[in-house]
Every structure is written in C-alpha cells, then in structure tokens.
Amino acid sequence: MKIGYKELHIPANADGSPKIDINSLHIWPRGNFMLMGLANLDNSFTCTLFMPIEGENSFESLKSEEQLISFFATYFPDTKEALPDLVRDFFRNPNSYLAIMKCFPWTFNDKVALIGDSSHAIVPFYGHGMNAGFEDITILNEMMQKYGDDWDQIFKAYEISRKPNADAIAELSRRNFEEMSAKTADTNFLLQKKIEKWFSDKHPEKWMPLYSRVTFSLQPYSEALAIGDFQNEIMQEVLKMDNIEDNWNSEEVENKILELLK
C-alpha cells in the first residue's frame, strides 16, 4: 500500500472536558484518504491522517503552511477548532509508512522459523497484528506437542497451517482501510451493515458479521474471510430488492436472507 500516516493531536478543553465525543471512534472518510480520532484517558484525542505518499491529496502535496491549512479547510472543516496545533504537529511529527509483507517459506530446514511480523507484516486496520503473532505461537506449540523433537516436521506443519491465515488477515486489514476511508460515507454500505446487524441479532446462530467473526471468535482468519465473502454476496442480492431502504427490517428481507443461506 502506498499509504502513509501522520499523528496529530486534539487537546482537551481548558476545563479538562473533551472537545469531541469521548465515547466514539471518529472517522472522516474522504475516499483514498481519511482522518481518524481515538480518545485518550486524559480526554485528549490522538488523530491519525492516513493518505497517499505521492500524487494529488498526498503528503507530498502538502509542503507549506498555506497548503496544509487550505487542505484541512476543504476536507476537514469541522476540525478547525479541535486541532489548534495542526501546523506545528503536521510539520514536526514524522511521516510513517504502511506495509503488507508476504513471504514463503517461513522456515529453513529444522533450524529457523519466522514468527509474527517477520513473516507477515500487515496494516493496522483490524488491530490484529499482535494477535496474528500470538496465533503463530499457539500453532507452533501445538505442532511441538504433536511431533515431539522432529523440528523439521514441526516447522513444515506450522508454516503450512499459518500461511493461508496470515494472507487472509492481511487481505482483511487492507479491505478495512477501504471500508473506513471510503465506504463509511456510502449510504448503501451503511444500509448493508444495518441489515446485517438486525439479521444477526434475530438469528445469531445463522449470521455473525465479519468484523465480529474476526475479532470475537477463534475461527481461522481464512475461514472468516471466505464466510465474509459469501455473506457479502448475499447482501448484494438483498440490496437489489425493491424499496429496500424502507423495508430493510421486514419479514420479506428476513426470509430472503434465510433462503440465500440455504
């Protein structure tokens, strides 16, 4: 991904209260770039500007104070009061870069095995980089219990098991950036998520939303990705239904999803 990021800061008010809602994840989606705000314990916010490195609307294009102020006035006008130190933070804080790294094999004979980011660095938009590394350790330990001192077999079984899941969480993380930066401003996408939540609440045994499946279950990432793609195909059919905007929580929609799940 040719995307970088830079951290900015929203301080608390003089009386210690937050400038924006403290109980929300704040996202300003703008297509191929976005601003995100996460609350801190002191009622301040750490904001992150994710943006292409080069091209129009990129870090490369914001070289002067005037360009920066004009850019924020155009795309994030409601942050003017919240970011009093925008210019200082932007030009003082470093640009960092996002990367997805895939490789194989992860092992060399019975001597060395790569684990975690050394074998599958991913972008942070699912928050699962560390969890994926812990899963590596879990599977490696299982193979050690299964194959004893046969490290060649341990390593082979470990990398074969983990590679598809590492690739899957890399893809899920990449897609989540696209969802946050662009689709959260799309009315059809928001309607889809509303229908999924409604149907899942009614039929939790039949439908777990993709994000919940990845984050709150022990299901392998590769299975979660495949099921999520299947669910998305169903939802694209549901969104084609007549008057879906008004009838999104109707019995007709419920029956349609149940039929497509068969």
Language model: regions and residue ranges:
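Conserved mid-domain beta->alpha element of the FAD-binding
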Residues: 8, 94-185
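Conserved short hydrophobic patches within well-ordered secondary structure
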Residues: 20, 67, 117, 122, ...
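Conserved FAD-binding catalytic core of PHBH/FMO-like flavoproteins
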Residues: 1-98, 102-108
